[in-house]
């Protein structure tokens, strides 16, 4: 004789319980109403370093960092100019997501200051996950800006590309067109 045990979900749909029992789930029978399935107890520890790198890599092509609005002289202004100047907003947003810094930023200098206060250390050779700061370049009419992004390995980095207005993968030194000024590393990423 085969006993087939079925549960019933909240919408009244029946489902077999046997396979769940074989996988280690517990079943609580409720008279004539339904059965509750409880996941077996597991110890789950988030892998922050790998998740951080995955978020950086998965951010490629994302337009969520394109606009950052502020009131400038009482007027609503997109201070990132539709993604042209979004590098610090992008990098600080990702870092803040993992509590690697204290707050989000709109400038490279304020992001670097927060990184240093938050325990990031200067290193000579980039490690996967390190934050890279590139030298200032002239955007137009004497409008000089530094640049910031993430090192992902194999001489590759991800940063907000001004011409695109969103993060993209590129050569670490933009094919020797931009010098690295500073590399910062967080010991928590080991």
Predicted regions and their residues:
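N-terminal capping segments
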Residues: 36-104
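Short Gly/Ser/Thr- and charged-rich N-terminal loops/segments
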Residues: 1, 19-27
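Active-site or metal-binding loop neighborhoods of secreted/extracellular toxin and effector enzymes
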Residues: 157-190
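...with weaker cross-activation on analogous glycine-rich loops/strands in unrelated enzymes
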Residues: 103-169
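Acidic/polar hotspots within intrinsically disordered regions
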Residues: 6-9, 25
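N-terminal secretion targeting segments of exported proteins
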Residues: 23, 31-46, 188-190
């Amino acid at each position: 004789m085969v006993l087939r045990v079925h549960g019933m979900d909240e919408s009244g749909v029946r489902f077999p319980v046997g396979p769940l029992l074989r996988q280690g789930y517990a079943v609580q029978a409720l008279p004539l109403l339904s059965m509750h399935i409880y996941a077996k107890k597991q110890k789950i520890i988030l892998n922050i370093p790998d998740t951080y790198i995955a978020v950086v890599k998965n951010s490629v092509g994302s337009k969520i960092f394109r606009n950052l609005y502020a009131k400038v002289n009482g007027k609503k202004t997109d201070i990132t100019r539709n993604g042209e100047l979004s590098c610090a907003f992008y990098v600080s947003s990702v870092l803040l997501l993992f509590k690697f810094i204290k707050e989000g930023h709109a400038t490279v200098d304020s992001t670097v200051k927060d990184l240093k206060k938050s325990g990031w250390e200067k290193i000579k050779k980039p490690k996967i996950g390190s934050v890279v700061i590139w030298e200032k370049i002239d955007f137009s009419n004497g409008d000089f800006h530094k640049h910031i992004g993430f090192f992902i390995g194999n001489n590759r980095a991800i940063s907000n590309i001004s011409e695109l207005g969103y993060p993209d993968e590129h050569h670490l030194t933009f094919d020797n067109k931009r010098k690295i000024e500073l590399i910062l590393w967080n010991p928590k990423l080991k």
